[in-house]
Amino acid sequence: PAAGIFTDSPVIKTRRVGGLAARQCATFTFTSQGHPVLLCGGFTSFQLQLFDPDTLDRLAKFDLPMRPSGIEAIVKRDPEIIFLDTSSAYVYLDNEDRIVIGDSKQRIRRIGPVESDGQWEFKEFDSWDMNAYIPNDCFSLTNQNPDGECDALTTVMPDHSGVLWWVTRKGRIGSLDPKTGKVVATDFGGEEIQNSFAIAKSGAYVVTDHAMYRLELDDGMPTQRWRLEYDRGTGRKVGSINQGSGTSPTILGGGKYVTWTDNADDKIAIIVAHTEGVPEGQTRQICRVPVFKSKGSATDNSMVAYDRSVILENNHGFTNALQHKDYSSVTGGVVRVEVREDESGCDIVWESDLKIPSVVPKMSLGNGIVYFYSFDLLENGDRLWALVGLDFETGKEVVRIPTGTGVAFNNNWASIAIAPNGDTYVGTREGFLKVENR
C-alpha cells in the first residue's frame, strides 16, 4: 500500500463544503479510480459528495433525508442532540463503487457515482424498505411529541456471501439478502447499539451497551454464538455517546481475536477475546487492560489493530466543536497494547500523552505510522490543529503538520483517511482538508 504523508514540505488543501451553513464531511471512501466519495452532514440533511482528487472540485452530490435528531436539535436549539446520534453516519463502498447506507427513512440504499460524457452524477441502484421491522414514530415538525417508538438504522455491513447485516440504535439486528429481498430480524432485548460492528468469516461481532456478541446467520436469522458482558460503568462520560463501549469491535490477529473497550468508572479498559474456539485451559476473554488516567478516560472511536497489537486514543473531556469552550479539559493519551504470543494476557507496549479530542485514527502499513489529529493551545486561547504521526513500534512522534487555527479546522469527531496514492484527508467542521507531498 502507498505510504501516508511523511514529508518536511507538505501541501495542504482545504475545501469548504456547503453554502452559508457549512457541512462537516466525516466519512471518506475512495472509488476504484481514486475519487473521494464523502458523507457530509449538516443541520438540514446529509449528502453524498463526489470530488476530483486533484482539484477538490465537487463533481456530484446526492441528498439524503434529514434525520429526526436534526429537526429536534433545531426546534429545541440543542446541537448536542445531533452529536448523540450515530444513525446514517456509517457507510461502506462495495466492489462496484456503490455506497451502501441505511438512511433516516429506514431504507437500505445502494447509490453510486456514474459518469457520462465527462459529467458525473449519483444514481440509486437499489433501495429496500425496513419500516416493517423498525419503528418510526419519530420527531418531526408536525410530530413534536411522538408517543410511539422511534428507532434508526445505524450501520449496514456485508458478510463474505454478500448478505447485508444491519443494526439499529435500540438494539434491533437483521439480515437482508439483496438477491431475493428476504429480511429476517430480531433484537437484543433493549440493549443499545451506538457503534458500527465487525464482520469476519466466523460471523458478526456486535457490541451493545452491555455486552459483546458473536453472531452467525441461521437461515438468515442472526443467532448468538457467544456473549461476553463487560463493565459498563455507572453513567455516560464526557467524551462518549452513551453508557457503554465507545468503540466499534475490531478484528485482529488474523481473525483469531476481537477487541473493544469497556466503560469502567475509574479507567476504561481494552478487552481482547477469542473469536471462535477457546484453547484448553484458557477463557474466552484473553485480557482486560485498564488504560489512561484515573477518572480521566473515555473513548468514542474505533481502535487501530495490526497483527496482535491494538492502539487506542483517549477522548475524555471533549464534547463537540459547537459547544466546547475549555480545551484544557481534554485529557489526552494514546496507548498500544499487545496480545502475548502464548495468549496468557496482554501488555502495554508504549504510551503517549498526545491530546486527540475526537478523530478516528488511521495507520499506514506503507510506513508504519499511525496518524492522529491533535492541537496545541495558543496564548490567545485558540487552537493550532495538526496532523500528527506516531511510530507504531515506539510511539514516538515522527510527523507533525500544522493545518490551521480556529473552529473551521476542528475535526469534530470526523475521521482521517489515507487515499490509495497516500494523500491524507481529514474531515473538518466546515468540510475537509487534504495533505499531500509537494
PLM regions with names:
Residues 4-16, 61-82, 121-147, 190, ...:
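Surface-exposed loop and turn segments in beta-propeller and other repeat-based domains
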Residues 30-34, 93-96, 158-161, 199-201, ...:
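Residue-level detector of Asp-centered blade-edge/turn motifs that repeat once per structural unit
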Residues 43-52, 105-119, 170-177, 210-216, ...:
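Structural motif
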